[in-house]
C-alpha cells in the first residue's frame, strides 16, 4: 500500500541526473538500425534451426560423419557410430534427444561470450541498440543482478568448450574414412567438418577469457616470454573475435545440415579419393 512517503525514483544510465539532458534519442543520420536488425535476424535464424535439429533426434550420423550437434553422443539411444564418440553414459531412462545433453556446453559458451552478449543486448533488448543511440530503458543495472550476473561463469564454459572442441577434432579425423570405415579417404563431408573445426578452434582460442588465462595476472611479461608470445598470438585472433564468432556459428550449422542431408538420403557424399 502506498503511503506517500516512498523515495522518488532516480533514473540511471543515459537518463541519470549526471548526464546531459538531450531531448533527441540520437543525432545519427545513417541507418544505424540495420546492424542490430541483421544481428537479431541472424541469431534468431540459428536459434530456430538449432532448436529443430536438437529435438529432432534423427539424421545426425552418416558414416563416417557425425553432426557436431550430437557429438559426443552420451545416451544409450544414440545411433551406432563405429569408432565414433558414442558413449552410453545415460541409460535407457533418457528418452529425449542426446543432443540436449551436450549442446548446453557450447551454447553456454557462446551465450556468455563477450561478443555475443553485445550482439543480443543490442539486437533483442536494445540495450543500447547502437553506438550514440540512447536505450529506451529508464534504469540500468548492467550485469549485477540475476539472471545477467550468471554471465560471469563464461570462463568456466570456456573450460567446458575445450574438450568439446577436442572431440569434434577427433570426429574430423574419423572423417578421413569412407562409408565402409576404410582409412585414407576424403569426401566433401571431410572438408566441411575440417573447415568447421578450424573455425571452432579459432573462435574458442580468440575468446577474451582465453587471452586473460594466458597473459593475465602477470606483472612482468619479460619474465614470462612464452606466455607473452602466446598472449600476443591470441590477441591477434581476439581482434577478429566477432568475425570468428559468426563464421564458426554458420559453419557449425552448415556442418550439421550437410550431415542431415546425407543421413536423410538427399544425396551421396561426393568423394575426392
Ranges and model annotations:
Residues 2-273:
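Membrane-embedded alpha-helical bundles that constitute the cytochrome b-like, heme-associated redox core
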